[in-house]
Amino acid sequence: MPKSGKRKQAEVEQKPKSATKSAKISNGLKETAKDPYPNHPRPTAEECLSVRDDLLAFHGFPKEFAEYRKQRLISRDADGTRISEPSDLKESVLDGLVRTLLSQNTTEVNSQKAFACLKSAFPTWEDVLAAESTCIEDAIRCGGLARTKASCIKNLLRCLLEKKEKLCLEYLRDLSVDEIKAELSHYKGIGPKTVACVLMFQLQQDDFPVDTHVFEIAKAMGWVPVEADRNKTYLHLNQRIPNELKFDLNCLLFTHGKLCRKCIKKGGNQQGKESDDNSCPLLRYRM
């Protein structure tokens, strides 16, 4: 997941005050996407709302995503329709994409350090493209998989320059979700999760990335069949979760997965917020 971004409006999205609000929630279905589990009825819109509210009450909204949340507010009108993009964006789409690439298979701290080192060594993307691959590898080595990631970044920049004659992805802001997915999928090393993160964070689109934390929690709650893999989980959840809940719910599930010992596979994180397994707000949703 990317780090915090930018937005102006101080207020955060208002959560519904009563369960009756859920009746107004749209189903968020995408006409062009196919649900691999059309007969699996969960999660319902009401369940998504309830989980969102329970996690929000338990954790508060994660500070690392607060600025992205503000961006979403100022890029939409009163009824939630997307309008013009914020004018004060500090992070370009290309920056966000590379940042997400560097976050693969490493910790948040290491990926942030790798991106900072890359930008320090090569201030512009033209500098990165002109650099030797070994130099890029050295700059991002702290993030792991340096050779693979350096090759992916170089290939992305090379193909982008050939296609658009400049190193810029801002044109994606004018495309539909399906068009954005088609564009980014052409680049080697950019998978569904990376695309979904860019859609949700940099482009303020309604998408629901599925990382390890979200995947494990979704399976534990029975939101997908036990045999589901991450790609099918992504397709199913994007069909089932209402668009207006996707951003908050995704950020909260990701954060909860990092902090809750009960929800962490193999009990890895010892810095979890919950000292008592029974305090996990998701226990009542588990199968």
Predicted features along the sequence, with ranges:
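N-terminal polyanion-binding entry modules of DNA glycosylases/AP lyases
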Residues: 1-175, 242-245, 251-287
